UniProtKB/Swiss-Prot annotation:
PROSITE patterns: PANCREATIC_HORMONE_1, PANCREATIC_HORMONE_2. Its main location: secreted. This is Pancreatic polypeptide prohormone. CDD domains: PAH.
Amino acid sequence: APLEPVYPGDNATPEQMAQYAAELRRYINMLTRPRYGKRDRGETLDILEWGSPHAAAPRELSPMDV
């Protein structure tokens, strides 16, 4: 993971604060961006396989569903 930017202090110049704000924004975006990897692959394949013979058969509604 990227390192969190260091706060320049209360006496920092506006340029230093702007630099810190930009680095902090990049850092937060990096931590919160969606990840598309092996774990997501299962969900996307389900959509593609709707018509395949391996798709789960629709089940009857149970009393719990009603």
